[in-house]
Design a protein with these regions (language model features):
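Two-component/phosphorelay signaling modules centered on CheY-like receiver
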Residues: 23-42
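Active-site residues of response regulator receiver
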Residues: 65
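A short, hydrophobic beta-strand element within the central beta-sheet of small alpha/beta folds
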Residues: 88-99
Length: 168
């Protein structure tokens, strides 16, 4: 008998995700999963490709593998922090090198969210919710109502989770 769990998925409010991952199979799995709940995923195979994407496009979340050819995750983060500082809190780091003191020290120094490979996809959803929640808390916009003059506060780019998906 298999056990199944149900996870909330976002409405069709399209979220943009930059996925930096050198492993083709893993990247395809993550991309397909995220597209199931209306995320637009752009993949970069290394930090150089990632920077090109960051310059051209805005992203709601950045999934960043730490070990990539040409330009590893820590160097990519530092470069992004310089050109688009507001993106520094949109990172979710992914690595299979849990015992590596270099990656551990870096991730701790930037207070990064981390997914240790292999990870269950619901952990990815949880991490993304955390990034979106932080973004909403930081980007609260004030709207004044014309009819009543009342002040209403609402988050920009909300990420509602009302669809449901069962993973067995």
């Amino acid at each position: 008998m298999s056990s199944s769990q149900t996870y909330d998925l976002p409405e069709t409010n399209l979220q943009t995700v930059l996925l930096l991952e050198a492993d083709n199979e893993f990247a395809a799995t993550v991309k397909k999963f995220l597209e199931l709940y209306s995320c637009r995923v752009t993949r970069a195979r290394n930090g150089v490709e990632g920077l090109q994407q960051i310059i051209r496009t805005d992203f709601d979340v950045i999934l960043c593998d730490m070990v990539m050819p040409t330009f590893p995750g820590d160097k990519f983060y530092i470069a992004v922090e310089r050109i688009k500082p507001r993106y520094s809190e949109r990172f979710i780091f992914m690595t299979g090198h849990k015992a590596d003191p270099k990656w551990d020290a870096f991730i701790r120094s930037v207070r990064g969210l981390t997914l240790w490979k292999p990870f269950p996809m619901h952990d990815l959803l949880t991490a993304m919710r955390t990034v979106f929640r932080r973004s909403r808390e930081r980007d609260v916009v004030d709207y004044s109502t014309v009819m009543t003059g009342a002040l209403v506060t609402a988050p920009k780019g909300s990420f509602p989770f009302s669809k449901r998906m069962t993973i067995q």
